[in-house]
């Protein structure tokens, strides 16, 4: 079986990342809208981390939110990070393996879409995220879509 980061790197090279963005847009919009409203209700600025950021489209979306003071994306596919960095010099993009990444800072909002099932040990990684990367009172919001037919 091929490693997911290799496949997604090839997708970045051939433009398939745009299809991923479009396919996930509605679900991500719901998740992010909920989290942003929650932050607004707290009347606090927040920093944001996108795990498995792909071409950075969610990072760019959050960097334009008035309460978001910092927006960071990490992805295991080097080509995705290169693509994200080319179109966005304001945010930080890191080529990292989520399973082994050690964040030097904590975040108020951590987002992940269609990533958890690629991890070596999802439960352990989620524990690491909540214990070490998420600020007290922060929010981890993750999504996995269920497709009922191949596309």
Stretches with model-predicted labels:
Residues 123-136:
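A short glycine-rich, Lys/Arg-flanked "PGG" loop and its adjoining helix->strand segment in the class I
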Residues 49-51, 55-100:
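Class I SAM-dependent methyltransferase SAM/SAH-binding core
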Residues 1-41, 58-61:
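Conserved class I S-adenosyl-L-methionine
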Residues 114-115:
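Short catalytic micro-motifs in class I SAM-dependent methyltransferases
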Residues 111:
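A conserved beta-strand element that flanks and buttresses the S-adenosyl-L-methionine
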Residues 147-151:
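Conserved small/polar residues in nucleotide/adenosyl-binding loops
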Residues 137-145:
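Conserved beta-strand signature within the Rossmann-like core of class I S-adenosyl-L-methionine
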Residues 45-47:
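Nucleotide donor/acceptor-binding cores
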């Amino acid at each position: 079986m091929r490693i997911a980061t290799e496949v997604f790197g090839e997708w970045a090279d051939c433009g398939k990342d745009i299809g991923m963005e479009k396919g996930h847009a509605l679900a991500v919009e719901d998740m992010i809208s909920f989290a942003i409203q929650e932050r607004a209700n707290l009347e606090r600025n927040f920093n944001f981390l996108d795990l498995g950021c792909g071409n950075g489209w969610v990072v760019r979306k959050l960097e334009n939110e008035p309460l978001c003071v910092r927006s960071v994306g990490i992805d295991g596919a080097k080509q995705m990070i290169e693509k994200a960095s080319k179109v966005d010099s304001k945010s930080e993009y890191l080529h990292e393996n989520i399973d082994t990444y050690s964040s030097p800072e904590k975040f108020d909002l951590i987002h992940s879409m269609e990533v958890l099932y690629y991890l070596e040990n999802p439960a352990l990684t989620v524990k690491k995220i909540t214990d070490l990367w998420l600020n007290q009172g922060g929010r981890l919001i993750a999504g996995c879509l269920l497709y009922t037919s191949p596309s």
